[in-house]
From Swiss-Prot:
UniProt superkingdom: Bacteria
Name used for this protein in its record: Argininosuccinate lyase
Organism this protein belongs to: Magnetococcus marinus (strain ATCC BAA-1437 / JCM 17883 / MC-1)
Catalytic activity from the UniProt record: 2-(N(omega)-L-arginino)succinate = fumarate + L-arginine
Taxonomic lineage of the native organism: Bacteria, Pseudomonadati, Pseudomonadota, Alphaproteobacteria, Magnetococcales
Localisation: Cytoplasm
Amino acid sequence: MSDGKPMGKLWGGRFSEPTNAFVEAFSASIDYDARLYRHDIRGSIAHCAMLGRQGIIPQADAERIIQGLQQVRGEIDRGEMHYSNALEDIHMHVESRLTEIIGPVAGKLHTARSRNDQVATDFRLYLRDELDAIVQAIRTLQGGLVMLAEQHAHVIMPGFTHMQSAQPVTFGHHMMAYYEMLKRDYGRFSDMRPRLNRMPLGSAALAGTTFPLDRESVARELEFDGLCENSLDAVSDRDFAIEMMAACATLMMHLSRFSEELILWSAPAYRFIRLPDAFCTGSSIMPQKKNPDVPELVRGKVGRVYGALTSVLTLMKGLPLAYNRDMQEDKEAVFDAVDTVRACLRVFGDMVPGIQPQVATLRGAAGAGFATATDLADYLVRKQIPFREAHEIVGTIVRMAEQQGVDLDGLTLADLQSVDGRIESDVTAILSVESSVNARQAIGGTAVATVRTAIAMAKQELAL
């Protein structure tokens, strides 16, 4: 432009000199927000159709604009859009290309709309789609866990506290613990959807608009549950993204804990499970290695998602109402976190059905470490011995077993009675790990029958 104004800027009328070239690159977001194009165009089509219906712009112009937007969408679908930092973001790219196709009438599209409510709408549409994909992926992983638990519901393994053998449980019970964690994750995402699914469009820059919009019809077209009812709030907050990141972070924490156990259990020091070869890699120098790369990567990627949550929280904490350019920085963190979560869910969903528990190793480990000591204490309590006294008695018996180098079921009845004469011959029935496991039949317990009941309920929940 001969007058030195910013070339091609839809906001350039106010300015007397072009934007600094590095500032264009520094402030552009097209490298990462291009993914919003379908949501942006969908929102624009719904907005434009409403402008025509309301008589705010001529119906013929609305139809031309919508046809042009559909053409732009097709071009981007086919990879024909050429991106430029000069156009800043996907919203400007779409409008600029629309202008090239249909001419100045394209400028009517932005009537009664700001990039502030436009971006907020696009972001919510995008996150809604991602949320729906995430909850479906959670269900897939839950299904894999349930099938694995059902197949190995009877397999006895050690349960740990402080990384020490505590009480025997079943492999199925352990897998169902992760099912329950994921069930709550599913609930968190589902619970937030109604809060996410509110439409900001029509709020304009911050104060609303003087045009007679029909926001409700646009909301219905875009499948929103309702409207953002305060224009300042609609364009100013990103709590919906923060809530999404918090749910993602919690989900990833659960996947990380599962990953940690898979890494330990597959190590030669444990040999509790075998991971499928297709989800492991080898070493460039040590030919014997089978490395659990998938769980390790999932465990490592948690930091990215935690970082995204912290990033958006920190970004928003000091911003006065309404929109500030700082808020552009929410997208990259959120996009990366969502991509990471979906990838981790997918790879776990594919890997989990192929996990092979090593039954004999697990059973042997379950019997070590005096894991039935609590059962012995419970046995004494049933003889009307106060639990604290029973605890002391069993502690003495454990020390005796340690000194003899045997487990509890390796002690003779005479050994046991030398500590407390109230112990009788029926004690042998409760010292095996099988008895310990199957005695825990209360809801939530690890008895095989109880676990199978939990599995049946889970299959009903998942419609398996």
